[in-house]
């Protein structure tokens, strides 16, 4: 029997969705692997709670291997903390105010704008505890097992060839890349990724419930598990090799 791997889509601060989806998993054993695809923070109301669960509780609850990948939103906050990146924190759509409010234990309304004080605080990231920044900085860019390659956003193409993550000179590209050529044209070992919400991918190219454009997207050799958690959608966990899904909805 092949070892089981469970890939958790982008959580984006939705602690309730994460708890609901995890509660639907079958009992895990020491041979299983639980992989979180990154983007733990921003947009949803409980980024601090998600980070606490992933950092402290899941290592105790998961009997097998736990892999927490780095997402582009973790990369964004690391850049903010190391010198500032206003282009990341200012756009309302990035949901950075929700993260600040979460770590301050304060609520946030949808599309609410930050105060002047909050905007200054966000631009420096000083509200993030050092231990959280250190944790984000230690998150790996990718993982691979017998079933698939797991990476937050996708693979990088160079000279007409899709590079294995180990060949990518700048690993941050693995967190931010977004090109339809990858989803439509990649052929090779299966890749599981998040980052691009499935509602933005062509449903007719998905072999998994193409009638539901919000559902997990399964192409020829690419599977996308970002089903909109924290931004009006739900959270999906994919079990490999069985291709079973467990959803928060």
Task: Describe each region flagged by the PLM.
Residues 145-147, 239-244:
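Short acidic-glycine loop/turn motifs at beta-strand connectors
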Residues 7, 34-36, 68-69, 149, ...:
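Residue-level marker for buried hydrophobic side chains located in beta-strands
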Residues 110-224, 228-233:
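Acidic, His/Gly-enriched loop-helix segments that form or flank divalent-metal centers
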Residues 10, 39, 54, 71-72, ...:
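Divalent metal-coordination and catalytic microenvironments
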Residues 43-140, 177:
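Active-site neighborhood of divalent metal-dependent phosphoester bond hydrolases
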Residues 12-16, 42-45, 73-78, 157, ...:
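Active-site environment of divalent metal-dependent phosphoester hydrolases
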Residues 2, 29-32, 63-65, 146, ...:
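A general structural motif
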Residues 1-53, 59:
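N-terminal active-site segment of His-dependent metallophosphoesterases
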